[in-house]
UniProtKB/Swiss-Prot annotation:
The EC number(s) this enzyme carries: 2.5.1.18
Gene: GSTU1
Identification of the protein by name: Probable glutathione S-transferase GSTU1
Function summary: Conjugation of reduced glutathione to a wide number of exogenous and endogenous hydrophobic electrophiles.
Residue stretches making up the GST C-terminal domain: 97-220
Annotated binding of glutathione, by residue: 15, 42, 56, 68-69
Family stated for the protein in its record: Belongs to the GST superfamily. Tau family.
The keyword Repeat appears for this protein: no
Gene3D superfamilies in the record: 1.20.1050.10, Glutaredoxin
One Gene Ontology molecular-function label: glutathione transferase activity
Entry's Gene Ontology BP terms: glutathione metabolic process
Keyword 4Fe-4S appears in the UniProt entry: no
Reaction(s) catalysed by this chain's protein: RX + glutathione = an S-substituted glutathione + a halide anion + H(+)
Amino acid sequence: MAEEKELVLLDFWVSPFGQRCRIAMAEKGLEFEYREEDLGNKSDLLLRSNPVHRKIPVLLHAGRPVSESLVILQYLDDAFPGTPHLLSPANSGDADAAYARATARFWADYVDRKLYDCGSRLWRLKGEPQAAAGREMAEILRTLEAELGDREFFGGGGGGRLGFVDVALVPFTAWFYSYERCGGFSVEEVAPRLAAWARRCGRIDSVAKHLPSPEKVYDFVGVLKKKYGVE
């Protein structure tokens, strides 16, 4: 029974949203049980746990479900305050901390609204619409690089380590190769500092353990193309 475990994650191997949760729990040193979902035949547990959206990831904490990856990340900060924070701790009356939290949330939302959406269109489209999506993706990556600046990590929790934005964005680095192949550009050329950040993150144990290889992701994209008749 999932309710007997402290933390259980209902997930799918290639989902960047589920990977966020896995990386966050690894960064916090939290042990959890991973349960792979068949998205073509979703489990009763998943459907009961997320009846509104009926999708992964879902975190079960002592049997209580928490849905939506960015919500889960913030929940982990709140539920396990003794672990490293992804967001700057909320201190009453601390305007700087409040601003840092708001900024981190903005950029995590940007990743979901812009990068994920554009990435999905890249493999679904053909011809000039696909090329236009490739140009859009290049601009999105440049925008993220500008926000990163000369910092080692985006931060959000402080301390020169992975923060909220890093954990939100880093799973998509496993998709960079697919974006390049579909969009006709090079991440290294359009956003070299962001590419360096991706390599730096990839050397961190919590990231390396939970991200699939770019080649495996590209193979999965090929399966999706065939499934939806794109090829």
